[in-house]
Amino acid sequence: MKIKHMPAKKSRLSKAQRDFLDTYFEVNPHPNTQERAYIASQSLVSEEKIRNWFQNRRTRERGDCKIASHRSAFSVNTFEENTSSVHPTSNDLYIRR
């Protein structure tokens, strides 16, 4: 009979750690190796977790930009569709018999 090992419990960052990382991300979203080592020592988080956090945050940032641009394009199209019936075009000014 094989004994299955339970995976290690995933540790979460504290609010203070997230705030520190968010602040650093605003200044530099691409920290180099030395900067990641500094961040890890200041936040008491492993360098690997810091590297992953920045990678995930950049991905999330790109995804948020795509969603925002899609929403703004959608709202402009919706606005144009809704206002076309309110404002007649030049062709609508001619009465066809």
UniProtKB/Swiss-Prot annotation:
Task: Tell me the GO molecular function terms.
Answer: DNA-binding transcription factor activity, RNA polymerase II-specific; RNA polymerase II transcription regulatory region sequence-specific DNA binding
Subcellular location per the Swiss-Prot or TrEMBL entry: Nucleus
Which InterPro entries does the entry mention?
HD, Homeobox_CS, Homeobox_regulator, Homeodomain-like_sf
Q: Which UniProt keywords apply?
A: DNA-binding, Homeobox, Nucleus
Question: Keyword Cell wall biogenesis/degradation on this protein?
Answer: no
Q: Which CDD domains match?
A: homeodomain
Name the DNA-binding segment ranges: 6-65
- Might you report a single GO cellular component term? nucleus
Q: Which domain of life is it from?
A: Eukaryota
Q: What is this protein called?
A: Homeobox protein HD-9
